[in-house]
């Protein structure tokens, strides 16, 4: 009877995962219709819905197991035996790797993230490595320019499954061919082979055609973002073939793609050639399998720990008032723990901070907010923790620690991509780097605002610089929606004494923000302030922020490009800004 019960439990978990991934694919499959109908609010809603599906179905399975097994559901040995049976269901199962992560999630929900041992859950995969690289059915089509690139692209784009007319397909093909001819030699292009994924990758207002361009000297990405104009006609906005560009398109600071992948391991294996710098975790994250990505991130961490002897240290940069941040010197992740007590000027709670991190995961990150993975009961060997960090942990987060003798358990933390803090980057930057990164910093604030996110604390220390020179926000404890903020101009002083007073002569409500004050607390360096004012002086105008708020309230969703504007084939967009003159001087705001 026990054996039958264990088998029933294993099958219940796998069936629960089937139900979850079936709904995942169903929501994903709707991306084409949402794109064709230009239903951008539905795009954002579907993104949130798909993220919530996983935890919802884990909860359903846990409830089923409690009904089926009763008290045995709390018996770790029973679940260890059941894991053995579950493993036996996976050799012929097409989504084995994510099914293992789903099992882990069910186990952790039952045991409150305790007793996390390899005999009880899938710390590492039970399946042979070769299964991760198998592509059992074609997921891409191959094209060869036998009759020239023009004809080949006509055939390729004619096969695109979108049910909308093209604005001017011959023009776009000319753009692509001209770009390729300026990037590669005629001999390279004559010997090229192009492999294109069968499924389009949907995100924001674009449908991406993803391909591999195989040339005699290597494999290159081939990415075409397809947009549609206000009349519902399609156009190709650019062609990207550089690995750095592809890396940013699939970057950790962007929302997940909607791409129909009934066998995700096959798609990840196919993507490796064009994204060699991405880890397995990053590739699963890019296609929306964020919970399995969390599993893979942890495996990458364990592999790094096993291969190195480094100690954890306090992360470089200004210490946070809300988060304790630590890292390994050569590891590309940081670990963030919410402090037990915050600095007096921080009027937030731990629950509010966690809600902000969840908001970021569900919101459109527009390439400007880093994604995070959340872990509970994270175990670290004490000898791997530097004395300085150990002291800091016991001083700042003792309520989140459990001492196991040789090991330390951190009850809750976030893992996040490591970047160079912007304030440290500025200290080492040359003149050109300084110009570029200040331009990026202002762009990051503007793009977040256009996506209905107000960063709150916009100090340099709260932003990081990626290896591609992108500026990304990573301090979320004060973020809120743009529509929740009251942007005000500072009223003129009533008397001369007002300007000399220590306290403001005007009332200030909790959500009041005065953009005129930004230059004073953002930039103490005069040269940096001058640069910032030249490039982004509009951020100091309340009218700029109010105009953005009005567009958001009217339901306008801004275009988001995962590449530099100069890479666009043509400037089809309307003017970005209108310049007006008011009492504060010249002020730019969105057109």
From Swiss-Prot:
EC assignment: 2.7.11.5, 3.1.3.-
Stored InterPro entries: AceK_kinase (IPR046855), AceK_regulatory (IPR046854), Isocitrate_DH_AceK (IPR010452)
Reactions catalysed, as given in the entry: L-seryl-[isocitrate dehydrogenase] + ATP = O-phospho-L-seryl-[isocitrate dehydrogenase] + ADP + H(+)
Positions bound to ATP: 315-321, 336
One BP term from GO: tricarboxylic acid cycle
Parts forming coiled coils: none
Family under the similarity heading: Belongs to the AceK family.
Name of this protein: Isocitrate dehydrogenase kinase/phosphatase
Organism: Pectobacterium atrosepticum (strain SCRI 1043 / ATCC BAA-672)
Gene name of the record: aceK
């Amino acid at each position: 009877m026990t054996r039958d019960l264990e088998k029933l439990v294993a099958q219940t978990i796998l069936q629960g995962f089937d139900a979850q991934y079936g709904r995942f694919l169903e929501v994903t499959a709707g991306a084409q219709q949402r794109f064709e109908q230009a239903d951008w609010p539905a795009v954002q809603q579907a993104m949130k819905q798909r993220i919530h599906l996983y935890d919802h179905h884990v909860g359903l399975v846990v409830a089923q197991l409690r009904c089926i097994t009763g008290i045995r559901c709390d018996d770790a040995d029973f679940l260890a035996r059941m894991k053995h049976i579950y493993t036996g269901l996976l050799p012929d199962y097409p989504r084995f790797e994510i099914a293992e992560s789903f099992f882990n999630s069910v186990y952790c929900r039952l045991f409150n993230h305790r007793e996390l041992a390899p005999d009880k859950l899938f710390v590492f995969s039970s399946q042979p490595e070769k299964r991760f690289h198998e592509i059992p059915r074609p997921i891409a089509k191959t094209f060869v320019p036998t009759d020239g690139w023009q004809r080949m692209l006509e055939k390729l784009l004619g096969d695109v499954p979108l049910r909308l007319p093209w604005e001017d397909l011959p023009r776009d093909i000319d753009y692509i061919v001209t770009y390729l001819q300026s990037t590669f030699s005629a001999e390279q292009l004559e010997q090229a082979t192009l492999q294109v994924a069968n499924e389009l990758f949907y995100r924001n207002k674009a449908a991406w055609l993803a391909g591999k361009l195989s040339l005699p000297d290597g494999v290159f990405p081939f990415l075409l973002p397809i947009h549609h104009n206000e009349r519902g006609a399609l156009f190709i906005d650019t062609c990207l073939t550089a690995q750095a560009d592809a890396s940013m398109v699939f970057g950790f600071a962007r929302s997940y793609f909607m791409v129909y992948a009934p066998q995700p391991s096959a798609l990840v294996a196919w993507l490796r050639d064009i994204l060699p710098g991405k880890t397995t975790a990053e590739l699963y994250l890019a296609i929306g399998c964020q919970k399995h990505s969390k599993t893979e991130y942890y495996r990458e961490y364990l592999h790094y720990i096993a291969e190195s002897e480094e100690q954890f240290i306090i992360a470089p940069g200004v210490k946070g008032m809300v988060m304790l941040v630590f890292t390994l010197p050569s590891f590309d992740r940081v670990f963030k723990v919410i402090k037990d007590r915050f600095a007096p000027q921080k009027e937030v709670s731990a629950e509010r901070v966690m809600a902000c991190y969840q908001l970021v995961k569900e919101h459109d990150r527009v390439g400007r907010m880093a994604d995070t993975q959340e872990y509970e009961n994270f175990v670290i060997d004490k000898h791997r923790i530097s004395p300085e960090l150990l002291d800091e942990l016991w001083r700042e987060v003792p309520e989140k620690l459990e001492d196991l003798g040789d090991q330390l358990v951190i009850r809750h933390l976030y893992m996040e991509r490591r970047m160079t803090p912007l304030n440290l980057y500025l200290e080492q930057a040359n003149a050109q780097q300084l110009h570029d990164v200040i331009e990026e910093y202002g762009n990051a604030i503007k793009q977040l605002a256009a996506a209905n996110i107000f960063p709150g604390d916009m100090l340099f220390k709260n932003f990081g610089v990626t290896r591609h020179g992108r500026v990304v926000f990573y301090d979320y404890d004060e973020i809120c929606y743009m529509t929740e903020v009251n942007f005000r101009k500072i009223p003129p002083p009533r008397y001369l004494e007002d300007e000399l007073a220590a306290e403001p002569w005007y009332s200030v409500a909790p959500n009041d923000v005065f953009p005129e004050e930004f230059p004073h607390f953002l930039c103490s360096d005069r040269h940096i302030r001058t640069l910032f004012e030249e490039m982004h002086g509009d951020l100091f105008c309340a009218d700029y922020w109010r105009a953005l708020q009005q567009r958001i309230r009217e339901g306008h969703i801004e275009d988001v490009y995962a590449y530099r504007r100069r890479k666009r084939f043509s400037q089809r967009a309307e003017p970005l800004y209108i310049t007006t003159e008011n009492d504060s001087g010249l002020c730019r705001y969105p057109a």
